[in-house]
Swiss-Prot record:
Membrane topology of the entry: Multi-pass membrane protein
Designated gene of the protein: ALG3
Main subcellular localisation: endoplasmic reticulum
EC number: 2.4.1.258
Protein name, entry field: Dol-P-Man:Man(5)GlcNAc(2)-PP-Dol alpha-1,3-mannosyltransferase
Compartment(s) where it occurs, according to its Swiss-Prot or TrEMBL record: Endoplasmic reticulum membrane
Length: 442
């Protein structure tokens, strides 16, 4: 039986009541949005990018350029391309022999053209300014994908030392960082979006990664994270992983072909010298040791072993089934082994494997800050440090890198800060992420 509604008695409509205006609460909500809400990055990121652009212009105009390595880069490039010397053991500059792979040579040959050696350093500074801003834009894209709160994003722009490394020093580390940020961004985009282009992305990502290695070997600190992430992105298909990894070797051969044809042994010995000794007086991280201990091979082996243990522990805590899945991939290299949610584990593995490498690095010179500074907003966020403590940690960390010359006090503080951050990451993040893995029916 239907109820008949009388037209004389229509349902009453609720009157719209405007909420009371509370300017103080609105202000609090606005501040909370641009400080803690990831959506606030739509406001914060463009503003910070604009401020960075203006700041870099000011730094270039107001602070004199400091020559450290750029002149040596130019001398080495001229010895190669003007004198025709391709023997890596004979190519030298004002600061010593050429110790970087052929990608470095290629990039600084281009820079030599634009700056005409040392004649137009200001042109080189402008190029490095653009390099900084492009790298920052990629960082922001990565942060946005990872839903970092704006207060963490701001940390990426607060380093006095980092600005100096780029536009006042012109170090080659900046180009390695550019390629590594691009590589991590590619893998992060893939991990955040289900796509059938896994093979394409992992192959192109491997090419970018190899480009970074061909500029400077510090990119190898990402290698453990790269191997596991590539395996996961390719869903355990070993053949796809091998194809992607082969691209690394392909680029190394292509970019160094001129040297490999002429003096292959000398090139490999000079460009990839893992036994190279670093100068103790410029090492920021181990000043609380004496120089003999710093140069001791036992100390170097201990650092390498500690790095290996930390990386393996981190990986197996996050992905305890890795050995079993890897064994299955070996037995069936063309078969899909795992399908997993990669949104957290891929960027986390990449950034923390690099950070562990930095913590146990034999030496950290001032320019090496660029190796990992861009990952600090993510690491601090993942460590679950509250905002006040996060800023305190960052300020203390920045103090260490701006303390000149390297000294015992800053060195102890730097090691303590980085070790404590790694411990917080272990406490808050080191739990199985890939546990409910869907397996393809055989």
């Amino acid at each position: 039986m239907q109820t008949v509604r009388s037209e004389d008695n229509p349902p009453k409509k609720e009157e719209f009541k405007r909420p009371p205006i509370d300017l103080l609460q609105d202000l609090k909500d606005g501040i909370n949005h641009v400080v803690y809400n990831p959506l606030g990055n739509k406001i914060v990121m463009p503003l910070m990018f604009l401020l960075e652009s203006v700041l870099l212009k000011y730094v270039i105009a107001a602070i004199p350029y400091t020559e450290i390595d750029y002149k040596a880069y130019m001398e080495q490039v001229e010895m190669i391309y003007e004198e025709g010397n391709y023997n890596y053991l004979e190519i030298t500059g004002g600061t010593g022999p050429l110790v970087y792979p052929a990608g470095h040579v290629l990039i600084f040959r281009v820079l030599n053209y634009f700056t005409e050696g040392m004649n137009h350093i200001e042109v080189g500074q402008k190029i490095f300014r653009y390099l900084y801003l492009i790298t920052l834009l990629m960082q922001y894209t990565c942060y946005y994908q990872l839903r970092l709160p704006p207060w963490c994003v701001v940390l990426a722009s607060l380093s006095k030392r980092l600005h100096s490394i780029y536009v006042l020093r012109l170090f080659n580390d900046c180009f390695t960082t550019f390629f590594m940020v691009l590589f991590v961004l590619l893998y992060t985009l893939r991990s955040n979006n289900s796509t059938k282009m896994s093979m394409v992305i992992s192959t192109f990502g491997s090419l970018v990664y190899s480009m970074a290695i061909s500029v400077k070997m510090n990119a190898l600190l990402y290698l453990p994270g790269y191997l596991v992430s590539t395996y996961l992105i390719n869903e355990g298909k070993l053949i796809n992983c091998l194809i992607s990894a082969s691209v690394i070797l392909f680029w190394q051969v292509i970019v160094s072909l001129r040297f490999l044809r002429s003096y292959p042994v000398e090139y490999l010995a000079g460009a990839f010298d893992f036994s190279r000794q670093f100068m103790f007086k410029w090492s920021v991280n181990w000043q609380f040791l004496d120089e003999d201990a710093f140069q001791d091979r036992v100390f170097h082996t201990t650092l390498l072993g500690s790095q290996f243990v930390a990386v393996v522990a981190m990986t197996l805590c996050l992905y305890p089934r890795l050995p079993l899945d890897a064994w299955k991939s070996l037995k069936a290299p063309f078969t899909q082994v795992v399908i997993a949610d990669l949104r957290f584990i891929v960027p986390f593995l990449l950034m923390t494997s690099n950070f562990i490498g930095v913590l146990f690095s034999r030496s950290l010179h001032y320019q090496f800050l660029s190796w990992y500074h861009w990952t600090l907003p993510c690491l601090i966020y993942w460590s679950k440090l509250p905002m006040p403590l996060g800023f305190i940690w960052y300020i203390c960390h920045e103090y260490c890198w701006n303390s000149y010359p390297p000294n015992e006090k800053a060195s102890i503080l730097l090691f303590t800060l980085n070790a404590s951050l790694l411990c917080l990451l272990a406490i808050n993040c080191m739990r199985p992420v890939i546990v409910n893995i869907k397996r393809k029916q055989q």
